[in-house]
Amino acid sequence: MLCEGLARAVPQPVRALPPPPPTTLQPQERRKLLSSFPRSTPKGRRDHAIALCLCELALRSDEVVGLTIDDLDWRAMTVRLGQTKQRRQRLLPLPDSVARTIMNYLKRGRPPTRSRALFVGHLAPYDGPLTASYVRVVIRRAFARCGMKPMGTHVLRHSWATWAHRRGSGLKLIADVLGHRSLESTQRYAHVNVEELRRVALPWPRTIR
């Protein structure tokens, strides 16, 4: 009795709860979102290319608008993301689907301008890059067209990381693509994988007596 009383009197350490798993899209939702962009207009081709950069390269909205034509290496099929005070420089492979979409935009969508920004406005004078807030509006409108709950660009980045981990990509590789300086920021995608396994796990069979 005395031991039990002492045990109750000893303060227990507070256990930090794991962060909630990030919201992600299912593959069919991602396809529906991308197919919602009208590719028959120059502006639609630009916005479709922006959406693919978010989905396939897992870029942040400010990284998308920061891209320049000089960041694309068509021979090596890579895209370079410049270094900032908070982020280190990254070199990412350029998937064929993204390369074709960007090339289609450059040939049939991007207005003539001296700006080196990859994505520019479609109202004169065409000499400035888009803003990150505009990119977020583009994606929220796409969700609305699909009849889905409007979400920010971060859900596309989270979806890429989650599905990359489920396909067997290591956390170090995912961290390199996302530009995380520490693996601690990437651990949450491993937690998502565990939760998915828990959800689909079969119940333990009952013992027949």
Where are these regions (language model features)?
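Conserved catalytic core of the tyrosine transesterase superfamily
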Residues: 1-209
